[in-house]
Amino acid sequence: MDDNEDELEEHQELVSDGSVEEEEEVEPDLGPVDSWESFNDRIDGLIFNERCDKSVKKLDERRLAILNRVRQQFREAPKGVAERCQAQKSPIDQRLELSSERLNELVRFGKELVTNVRVANERRELNRRLFEGAQKNQMHVKLQRESVETMARFENIKARWTELEETNEPMLLWDQIEEQKKRIAEIMARKDEMISACQAEVDRMNAKYEFDRERQAQDLCCLVERVDHQVETLKEAYKEHIQMLRQTIEEERQIFADNAVEKWRTFFDAMNANFDEKANLVRAREQFYARQTQQINESQEELTKSTRIRLEKECERLELELRRTRDNVLMNSEKLDYNYQVLQKRNEENVIINNQQKRRVARLHEAIGRTRRGLKNLYNTGKRNIARLSSDIYKLHSNINDMESKAHQARLNNREKFDRIWEINYKELNLLVDRVYHIDRIIHEQQLAMPWSSPVPPIPNINKAKKKRNNILEKFDMRIGRVPKNRVMPNSGVNCKPDIKELPPDSLRLMRNLIRKLSDRGGFLIEERLLKILEPYSEEEKCLVRIDNIFAALRIRHLRDVKELTKVFMPYTYCPNCQPQGLSPRKCAEVFMKDQKPNRLQGAAGGQPDEKEHRSTGDTFLPKSEVAAKRCHNHYLVMEPALCLHAMNLFTSKMHKKMYEHEPGSILNAVNLIQITDAEIRNFWRQFSACFPASKCKLWKTLEHGLNHYVEVLKMRVQYDAEVVFLRRQNEELRHLLQKFTV
């Protein structure tokens, strides 16, 4: 314990010394950085600087010294119970422990290899952030200085214009106007220089991004190679340790067999040798028991006499203790009386303490009142904070629109990057195919002495479509609920604008019933507090939303919209006179299932609308509704409340689809700007795999097989040479042993 405390004190002193040295050796501020390479050189210089790593090196050296000293103490210390148990372990257990230790070291080494790559990436990212921060600060300072100087020049020019108004001489006025033009030209030139500097910074950042991406790809390749190599190493190590464990088990089994044979042989020899001795011992034991029995009888008689005398003395002693017990009982009764009086006094003290506790409880109630008042104040402040946060939310909504425009620009940038990567891969594959053809031509002309011809003509590039930019204002119009200019409604009902009052009475009656069902089913949208407030009013006064507002919310402005709404709701209606039991649960389930299937298919296909399925569901229900309407002429149609919101959802989705569909021939406003499908891309890149026919592959495989066979022959030759050397060494050792035995 004393050694450990001394080591901890020395470690703390070393850490404190390191911190003092770090405070004393403060590095000067970084100056302006010219490029990313110079910044990396400076960072590496700081990292490998001896002054920066002085405290860290001291800590490492101190830690290693302490670790070596503790290990030396463990080696020199006498063996304890654990070491003796370790020495007594079987060879199998020792082999298992040794194998587990070595395999754990291999696994730990593999983890370190993988961790080194991650640490290098994190270090590179740290350097990049430091450099980008420095560059950003420099550019910001430069822009601020330029704006200050520009404003000063502008104020100077503005002041000179007032002086020009007072000048009456034409030549002097002309000279001063020319000077003003020169000053303005200088300001514009400085602005152009700043713009070019900013553009150069943007180009540098793009180049740095490409460089970092290539370096990251190299790190990933290195990491994959390390992992594969470590996996193969672990496989070989596990196989070797399993083989060694099998050999150890076989040796242990042979040792156990030899020990068992030797044990049984010695046992039978000892049993045959000691048989006569056991008979003699039995006769001697019988004589000894006879003598012992006689001695026990004599000693028992003497013990009985002594016990009688001892019991008489014990009886006299118990009588004396009985007298003493009576005296103690009298003393205890007097003590009980005294304790009773003491308890009465304590009871009086407890009454006083209870009164004090009651007063304390009263003070606590007062504290609770103060706490409640504080809670009320907190509630009011919370309301104010909620209002402030609501305003922040509105600001965030405006920021969302900006982010959408930025996202659109990012998609355009991704399209450009896709084109660049496509062009790079296309060029690399063409170069690779040319190299393969060149090698194949050399093989045919030089090795096989055969004429060579190109098997496949060159593959044309399919990614040559022009990029078209989408209009960002369309998304803003859709967000605020305005129909964009390039969205058109169907041409069927553009010119007709009849009034809703021209509807037949049946349609008006059905619409009134539908709106009532909607209001009944929308009760969950209203708070219970509002229902309690409206409870004392009449049914007409409870109406908070009028039909005009509902139609305005649903974008129903013409008679065709009302007819469309009626068509959507007709499949879910029934006649209460002809069908008093209402719609069957089976039909309701069919409605939900048929409407949910298109939605699931849309989600699986990536959100693309399926017009045919919506059309099919509408067509299946419309004939039934028309038949029911003809059969139940002038009947009062009703609707299930459970299907009301479902039908309204179908109507809104249908209207939204009509309002926001594109013009014929226009490109969809999709997120993906790449006009080539995945199948076309796969087919295009698969064409390169067919550039080299199967006959050429067989020829190359045949050559490879011959070379591999030659390599295997060389390996076998090396193995045979090693075996010959080993056998010669064994023969020399055996010859040496035979010479010793002959001597």
Swiss-Prot record:
Residues 175-332, 395-416, 715-742 form a coiled coil. Pfam families: NYD-SP28, NYD-SP28_assoc. Residues 1-10, 19-28 have a biased composition (Acidic residues). Disulfide bonds: none annotated. InterPro entries: DRC1/2_N, DRC1/DRC2, DRC1_C. Residues 1-34, 599-620 are annotated as: Disordered. GO terms for cellular component: axonemal dynein complex; axoneme. GO terms for biological process: axonemal dynein complex assembly; cilium-dependent cell motility; regulation of cilium movement. The keyword Ion transport does not apply. Keywords: Coiled coil. PANTHER family: DYNEIN REGULATORY COMPLEX PROTEIN 1, NYD-SP28 PROTEIN. Belongs to the DRC1 family. This is Dynein regulatory complex protein 1 homolog.
